[in-house]
């Protein structure tokens, strides 16, 4: 059973089509990144999944239930971290969690939830009016985890967190997915989406323009991977473009930059270069999710690269 499934999901506001014919599937235990520029239709789609808004056409199913016809069957099985939320300044974090546990009629320990999101027990007994943005974000996430939901819907979960907190958030999300929870989240920090997600969907102008793994998006856009080989001497007689799967070669000082339409040819290129000159360093690069996002939302071909771990060369 899919955690989320939409068919021809459409929402109109008068003459404006905010979401058009969206067909989306998120599987159980999957971490799915939901991306798009402002005004692309992400929030409207999420609101229809949560039955905060009714579709003009099409259907949305959440955990096997129709989101509009069976919302009560869904509510206690999902956890939500909304983009905008209000906390009660005069209540402590522990009191917030006790309220959330009662509201869901769940069997949960506030102290365990507090530990799970990286808050201290001392902080849990402070009034949240003095909390930082990052601490408030952790508290709302802890509330979302009440009852061990089958689906987490997270809007900008890393907002307000420092790098350490972002890493902890990523580990927490992965841990929930390992337990079988589906995680559906939107974020503007594309590097975090790339690091955490199994698949991504990209919305643009109300349409779902892409739904794939990050590597699958690279293949579909034709975003070539590259090797940068630093050499002791650039051999003028070396011909790498004759290798099928090599799409281009350029020279930058003492480095060869080789682009590939078929990344499987990298080893063959390294072997040929190594036979002609001394290789001092190798880096492998590929288009980042940010560049792929630009390619789908602006119609630009991804050109920049994001380093992978260095390759190893044997003489």
Language model features: what each stretch is:
Residues 65-68, 208, 232-234, 261-264, ...:
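Short, surface-exposed acidic/glycine-rich loop or hinge patches that mediate macromolecular interfaces
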Residues 79, 140, 174, 194, ...:
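Signal for well-folded cores of large energy- and translation-related assemblies
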Residues 171-260:
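ABC transporter nucleotide-binding domain
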């Amino acid at each position: 059973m899919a955690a989320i499934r939409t068919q021809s999901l459409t929402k109109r506001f008068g003459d404006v089509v905010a979401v058009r014919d969206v067909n989306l599937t998120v599987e159980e235990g999957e971490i799915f990144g939901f991306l798009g520029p402002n005004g692309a239709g992400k929030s409207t789609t999420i609101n229809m999944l949560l039955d905060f808004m009714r579709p003009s056409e099409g259907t949305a199913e959440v955990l096997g239930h129709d989101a509009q016809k069976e919302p009560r069957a869904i509510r206690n099985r999902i956890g939500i971290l909304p983009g905008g939320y209000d906390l009660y300044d005069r209540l402590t974090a522990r009191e917030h969690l006790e309220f959330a546990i009662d509201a869901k009629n769940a069997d949960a320990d506030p102290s365990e939830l507090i530990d799970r999101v990286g808050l201290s027990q001392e902080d849990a007994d402070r009034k949240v009016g003095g909390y930082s943005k990052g601490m408030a974000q952790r508290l709302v996430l802890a509330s979302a985890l009440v009852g061990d939901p089958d689906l987490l819907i997270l809007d900008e979960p890393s907002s307000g967190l420092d790098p350490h907190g972002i890493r902890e958030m990523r580990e927490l999300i992965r841990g929930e997915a390992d337990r079988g929870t589906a995680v559906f989240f939107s974020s503007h920090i594309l590097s975090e989406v790339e690091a955490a997600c199994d698949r991504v969907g990209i919305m643009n102008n109300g349409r779902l323009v892409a739904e794939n793994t990050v590597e699958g998006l690279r293949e579909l856009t034709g975003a070539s991977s590259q090797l940068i080989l630093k050499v002791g001497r650039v051999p003028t007689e070396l011909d790498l473009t004759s290798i099928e799967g090599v799409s281009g070669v350029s020279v930058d000082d003492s480095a060869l930059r080789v682009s590939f339409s078929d990344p499987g040819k990298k080893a063959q290129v390294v072997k040929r270069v190594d036979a002609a000159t001394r290789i001092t360093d190798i880096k492998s690069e590929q288009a980042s999710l940010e560049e792929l996002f630009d390619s789908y939302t602006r119609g630009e071909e991804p050109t920049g690269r994001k380093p992978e771990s260095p390759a190893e060369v044997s003489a």
